């Protein structure tokens, strides 16, 4: 139960925000109370905001009732800055608007747009989003800016602080200010004179303290996000510029960022990389220091543009070992102690090829004094250097994937001044070893002196917590006392480094930060406990539990226990923002498993299981697209299938029905055809509008599958058999009076075989064996007919498996959780295809990519293809393509994406049309077998973006 102040707050906001965007239930409060870090707080209220006006109203009410507020975008933060035990306001989906200046050098963004999406928007203009954190494919602009997250290339010259031009913010009292709008500035100065004057006073006081001003400049000469950002006070005179830049790195402790205008960066078209290997870590660091100084002679260019080396990523020997780097493995065989081997992944970029070649020559000359294990070799071929970067990207999942059950994967984040790098790196390596973190590795942005070190840490005992506390105290001493570096370089202060802000910065700087906080948030209601925290042990409290979900080790779903809750999966989860995301499903199942195992709170367990059914189970498409962006390759759909299996145990009515369908599949399919015919008849009689209205009402009241105008007519493969027979062989004309069943069809195709023709085994999917075309379809023939015709035009003889109408890949049962039946059907199909292909002699074609994807997972001994891949691979040179001038929109299915065939279908479409359009921000369609009929709202949400584009 919420307290009286929360109750009053709730009563008021329900008049401002729809109920479906206000969460007070146990399930969703827990789900949204998780970010990528290793802390957990459960909010009292979660509100999904849609507009600046809503934020203003919410902050006014929170101010009135004295209730703390935390803002959250993607929840990929690592230091505990996006969690709350009070009010959590989410600003993600629906905060995705943007605009680009005519010269493409500026972009205005709302906080909910993903960083990679910004890059996609800017790519046609040769520009890019300046900050480049490793989470750019998942993190949203609001979080990137408010954490001053940087990355491999942007360093300190192109981070959010350096490219920010103006900001639109909502202050703690609900006031809206646009620092880039003259009218807004004038209004704010008139209504908030004390605020305006206090900014000026702080600016002047900091500048008057020459020692403090010099320290600020020195501290920000390297990456630093510890505490609030004080650099604006020494960079800018204009109070509004100072206000805007104070937002960068403020982690939601000062105001809400509703919009930001930033300078875009030039995206160099020519790039080259080299993986340099040194036999000791100090030499590797010395080489980085030398490369940092390299500049070209273009005096008209900016200092950053003149820098020849754009990136240098250091990977210590444990990093190389974790990804089984082949050079490391070779070196390990040659020496007794391979612990010195260190790689530096180096990148240079240029505007022209000539400039790129010159850059490479300069770097190679610079490296001559250094001894490398293998010769220096740069490559400008993407297919080659992408392998280097894949090694770099693979470190985190490789180390995280080896963690023991119940431990969490921590990524610490420090920075040193470049001149200290050789000694500091060796010291850090020794410090970690001294504390017994034998599996920890050091890697990161060496060119900026910024390292990450990964720890697989348990917090289950007091000794575990003490070990981590001792480590962090020693890290604090090393980084601050010995090298005057940054305890947090790009991951945010959060709760993790809040106790050490004053220690790193000193009294004067910390007092200045406190003065800024007091000015912006006098009641301390904005993200309390973050950056400023009076508890010296807040960094070792409120740890997130990671209990095991009991799953058979042989099951692919067992991978969910490797989940570190980073949230990278959510960009591909279609229900994220609708019900629950893939990450949230794992979070909730962990808590449900914990409650089951402990038996401590049966009422809460019952409540969570009940509340989970619709958002967690029924609206999970189960397609596994989430695995494509997961660093551990976790398919949360596998977990959903296990949950569904538990609800349909053997002997249950549902399981028996599924088993009956599997055993009588041909008959069940035949019985569906009259149903489709009846629906088509009703459509013809009633018309589309009346039919839609009636069936929608029946769906809402009775729960029957929803009819749509696109519902196809019934179809039977053998209705086309006679045309196939005539087209393939005169010998088949004698079969024109035979019964049209699939057994006959197989016999007919066998008659036509000859030893010289190319052959293919064609298995039409269950859907295409049963369903034809919808009413008023612009297409004349069903897919099976078209497919056979196309194969014959390409000179292929078509072979069908025996008893085709009884066969299925098993997807139907897998999606329902009847996994053993699904595997049984897959085995039946494999046997039939093995026979039809003459033991794998001929390729096998299936016309439905989801079916083909499952076939590839369960059938290993045959070459299996879906239509686009088969046509592009085998028929492209045998057919004459005539391009249409009509634009063609292509939807790339989940299964095609997972099989790596997205480019294939687009390339094939370009052979057929002069203009091919792939709608942006469309992943899974949400139909998911029959989910589009039973839960059409999921399908509707998934396809909310393509209609305006098309």
Predicted regions and their residues:
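N-terminal flexible segment immediately upstream of the FAD-binding catalytic core
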Residues: 1-60, 64, 74-105, 134, ...
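N-terminal glycine-rich flavin-associated loop
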Residues: 13, 37-69, 87-133, 149-201, ...
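Conserved phosphate/anionic-ligand binding catalytic regions in large, soluble enzymes, centered on
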Residues: 75-78, 144-153, 240-265, 444-450, ...
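C-terminal substrate-binding/cap subdomain adjacent to the FAD-binding core in PCMH-type
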Residues: 144-146, 153-157, 164-393, 426, ...
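Flexible inter-domain linker/hinge segments
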Residues: 190-234, 511-572, 577-597, 693, ...
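Iron-sulfur cluster-binding electron-transfer modules in prokaryotic oxidoreductases
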Residues: 521, 551, 637-745, 751-950
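Non-heme iron-sulfur electron-transfer modules
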Residues: 532, 539-543, 576-612, 633-660
């Amino acid at each position: 139960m919420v307290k009286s102040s929360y109750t009053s707050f709730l009563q008021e906001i329900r008049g401002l925000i729809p109920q479906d965007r206000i969460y007070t239930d146990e399930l969703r409060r827990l789900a949204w109370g998780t970010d990528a870090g290793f802390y957990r707080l459960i909010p009292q209220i979660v509100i999904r905001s849609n507009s600046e006006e809503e934020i203003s109203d919410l902050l006014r009410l929170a101010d009135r009732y004295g209730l703390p507020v935390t803002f959250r975008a993607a929840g990929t933060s690592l230091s505990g800055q996006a969690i709350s035990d009070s009010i959590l306001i989410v600003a993600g989906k629906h905060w995705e608007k943007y605009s680009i200046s005519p010269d493409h050098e500026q972009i205005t963004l709302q906080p909910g747009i993903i960083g990679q999406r910004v890059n996609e928007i800017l790519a046609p203009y040769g520009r890019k989003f300046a900050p480049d954190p490793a989470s750019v494919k998942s993190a949203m602009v609001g979080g990137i800016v408010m954490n001053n997250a940087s990355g491999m290339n942007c360093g300190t010259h192109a981070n959010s602080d350096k490219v920010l031009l103006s900001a639109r913010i909502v202050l703690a009292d609900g006031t809206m200010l646009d620092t880039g709008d003259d009218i807004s500035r004038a209004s704010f100065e008139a209504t908030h004179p004390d605020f305006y004057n206090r900014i000026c006073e702080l600016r002047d006081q900091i500048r008057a303290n020459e020692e403090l001003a010099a320290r600020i400049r020195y501290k920000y000469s390297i990456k630093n996000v510890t505490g609030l950002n004080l650099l604006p006070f020494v960079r800018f005179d204009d109070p509004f510029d100072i206000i805007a830049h104070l937002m960068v790195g403020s982690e939601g402790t000062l105001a809400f960022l509703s919009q930001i205008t930033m300078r875009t960066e030039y995206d160099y078209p020519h790039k080259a990389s080299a993986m340099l290997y040194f036999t000791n870590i100090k030499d590797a660091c010395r080489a980085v220091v030398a490369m940092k100084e390299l500049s070209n002679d273009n005096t008209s260019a900016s200092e950053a543009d003149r820098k020849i080396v754009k990136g240098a990523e250091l990977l210590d020997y444990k990093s190389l070992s974790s990804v089984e780097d082949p050079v490391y493995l070779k070196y390990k065989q040659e020496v007794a102690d391979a612990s010195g081997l260190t790689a530096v992944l180096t990148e240079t970029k240029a505007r022209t090829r000539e400039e790129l070649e010159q850059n490479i020559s300069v770097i190679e000359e610079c490296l001559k004094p250094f001894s490398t294990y293998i010769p220096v070799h740069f490559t400008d071929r993407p297919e080659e250097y992408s392998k280097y970067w894949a090694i770099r990207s693979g470190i985190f999942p490789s180390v995280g994937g080896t963690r023991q059950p119940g431990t969490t994967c921590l990524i610490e984040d420090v920075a040193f001044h470049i001149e200290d790098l050789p000694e500091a790196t060796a010291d850090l390596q020794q410090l970690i070893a001294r504390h017994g973190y034998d599996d920890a590795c050091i890697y990161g942005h060496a060119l900026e002196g910024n390292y990450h070190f990964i720890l697989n840490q348990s917090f289950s005992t007091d000794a575990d917590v003490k070990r981590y506390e001792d480590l962090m105290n020693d890290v604090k001493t090393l980084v601050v006392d010995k090298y005057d570096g940054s305890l947090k370089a790009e991951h945010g202060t959060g709760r993790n480094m809040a106790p050490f802000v004053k220690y790193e910065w000193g009294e004067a700087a910390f007092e200045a930060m406190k003065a800024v906080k007091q000015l912006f948030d006098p009641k301390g209601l904005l993200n309390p406990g973050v950056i400023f925290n009076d508890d010296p042990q807040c960094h070792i409290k409120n740890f997130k539990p990671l209990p095991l979900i009991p799953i058979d080790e042989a099951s692919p779903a067992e991978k969910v226990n490797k989940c570190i809750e980073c949230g990278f999966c959510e960009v591909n989860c279609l229900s994220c923002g609708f019900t629950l995301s893939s990450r949230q499903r794992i979070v909730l199942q962990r808590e449900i498993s914990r409650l089951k195992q402990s038996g401590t709170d049966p009422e809460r367990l019952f409540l969570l299981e009940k509340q989970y059914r619709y958002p967690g189970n029924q609206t999970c498409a189960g397609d596994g697209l989430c695995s494509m962006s997961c660093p551990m390759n976790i398919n949360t759909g596998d977990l959903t299938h296990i949950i569904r299996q538990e609800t349909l145990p053997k002997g249950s009515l549902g399981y028996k029905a599924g088993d009956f369908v599997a055993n009588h599949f041909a008959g069940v399919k035949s019985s569906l055809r009259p149903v489709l015919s009846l629906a088509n008849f009703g459509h013809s009689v009633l018309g589309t509008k009346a039919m839609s209205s009636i069936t929608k009402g029946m769906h809402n009241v009775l729960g029957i599958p929803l009819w749509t105008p696109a519902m196809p007519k019934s179809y039977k493969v053998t209705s086309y058999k006679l045309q196939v027979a005539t087209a393939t062989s005169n010998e088949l004309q004698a079969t024109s009076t035979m019964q049209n069943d699939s057994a006959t069809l197989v016999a007919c195709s066998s008659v036509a075989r000859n030893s010289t023709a190319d052959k293919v085994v064609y298995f039409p999917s269950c859907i295409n064996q049963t369903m034809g075309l919808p009413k008023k379809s612009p297409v004349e023939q069903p897919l099976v007919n078209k497919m056979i015709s196309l194969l014959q035009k390409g000179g292929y003889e078509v072979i069908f498996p025996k008893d085709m109408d009884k066969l299925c890949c098993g997807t139907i049962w897998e999606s329902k959780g009847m996994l053993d039946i699904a595997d049984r059907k897959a085995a039946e199909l494999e046997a039939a295809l093995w026979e039809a292909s003459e033991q794998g002699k001929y390729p096998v074609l299936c016309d439905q990519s989801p079916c083909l994807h499952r076939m590839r997972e369960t059938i290993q001994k045959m070459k299996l293809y879906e239509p686009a891949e088969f046509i592009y691979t085998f028929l492209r040179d045998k057919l004459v393509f005539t391009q249409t001038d009509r634009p063609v929109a292509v939807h790339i299915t989940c299964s095609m994406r997972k099989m790596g065939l997205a480019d294939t279908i687009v390339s094939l479409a370009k052979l057929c049309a002069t203009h091919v359009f792939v709608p942006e921000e469309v992943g899974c369609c949400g139909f998911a077998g029959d989910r589009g009929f039973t839960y059409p709202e999921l399908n509707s949400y998934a396809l909310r973006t393509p209609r305006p584009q098309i």
